[in-house]
């Protein structure tokens, strides 16, 4: 699709990947970007820069994928939709009923609204979680679904529904399976922070980062800015009824990750190792980047060192801004 002069709705547009997708869209000559978000995980702060652009607005009524009438109203006149709203992996583990409602019923509602409002193209955010542990590396898009957690199950269901809607209603969609996403605007406090943030928290306190296991578990860490680029590449492409890995294609063990963070933070602390938890969900997951490069024109632009430095710089800046705001209103703790 030629996105010039087109209107887009970003469902989950205030979240980590969603807000960066909004930023990336605005680099093109699009007509309008509507953000549809209930702000449970996303924040308006993530949109501060985007909202300065007159082409961007937050949908003024609702923002929940369970509100089907409001959702359809938001899609009125939209040329393309990015569906990024979902409960995250650990939230799905703790609250599977809510995960079913949001990730499965919510995705059905998005597809139904696209068909009802004749949206020309839908980009669906799936996940590499559909693969589970790697049987072979790098994992191509034909890798078997070896998933064993509920988050991955919801994404598998979403993919199956997308395909069925394409064949029954002609839904023009493409799906993206993100690898391990990190970057600016990522949560760094609360119960659901990712492994990189846990390591940075320890380093901040002068403690050694702790790895569960021997550190050999390896993943494909992809910068959130690259995920946003992949979303826009997918929207522009001619690919239909297909799924693509979004990653770098490069393998990084948790031990290597911790070592990189220690160097970038200028910290000489040794790495600590602890017994591996029985709850460890996946131990190895590195995806092939070839199909995405060949068919939707996406290639990762940010290497791990650069991406981690961007995250570290943003995290430090954001923490300072939050502290300054708290001080200004008399909240010193």
Task: Please place each PLM-identified region on the residue numbering.
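Short glycine/proline- and charge-enriched loop/turn segments
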Residues: 137-146, 194, 273-274, 289-291
